């Protein structure tokens, strides 16, 4: 009987540890989710690749929720694109970051702009959420592909406000280098 009583306290300890494992694992996952969904000051980030979106990480198959900015940061310089995940609606943005605002230039590709309607150089809000303001548009290049034409438009003035955006744990959208090739325009 003495031998069994020695195992009883050890069994209780093991049962307690095993029962607590799923709870502590779950709390770690919830804690990690909270950290990913906290607004972050972009200027304070180290050099690297990032993705910020206007809505928290959907935790499903989607690459992002709301409107997103996928970018590379080096010092106070950023190079990336701002747009809607799973769509062809995006604008390349590069510039200087100050707190949660990027000030610099924008680049877009537009299909089939009528010759009589060149881009307007006046300031306008690009997105429905009104985070990206563009102005001073210039046509850089027009390329004809079969019967369609693609026009590259440079916006000499771009201002992107990312206040309140959420940092995702890793970039999941298309890499910046595949969409924003500033030198080839």
Language-model regions, residue ranges each:
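Beta-sheet ligand-binding and adhesion/scaffold domains
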Residues: 101-185
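Bacterial N-terminal signal peptides
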Residues: 10-21
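N-terminal glycine/threonine-rich, aromatic-flanked beta-hairpin/loop signature
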Residues: 60-94
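Tryptophan-anchored aromatic micro-motifs
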Residues: 31-64
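Bacterial N-terminal signal peptides that target proteins for export
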Residues: 1-12
């Amino acid at each position: 009987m003495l031998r069994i009583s020695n195992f009883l306290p050890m069994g209780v300890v093991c049962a307690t540890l095993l029962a607590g494992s799923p709870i502590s694992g779950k709390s770690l996952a919830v804690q990690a989710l909270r950290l990913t969904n906290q607004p972050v000051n972009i200027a304070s980030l180290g050099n690297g690749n990032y993705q910020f979106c206007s809505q928290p990480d959907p935790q499903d198959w989607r690459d992002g929720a709301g409107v997103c900015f996928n970018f590379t940061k080096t010092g106070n310089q950023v190079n990336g694109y701002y747009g809607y995940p799973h769509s062809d609606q995006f604008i390349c943005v590069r510039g200087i970051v100050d707190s949660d605002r990027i000030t610099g230039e924008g680049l877009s590709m537009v299909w089939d702009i009528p010759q009589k309607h060149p881009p307007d150089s006046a300031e306008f809000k690009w997105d429905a959420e009104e985070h990206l303001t563009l102005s001073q548009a210039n046509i850089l290049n027009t390329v004809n592909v079969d019967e369609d034409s693609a026009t590259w438009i440079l916006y000499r003035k771009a201002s992107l406000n990312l206040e309140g955006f959420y940092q995702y744990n890793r970039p999941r959208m298309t890499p910046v280098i595949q969409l924003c090739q500033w030198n080839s325009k």
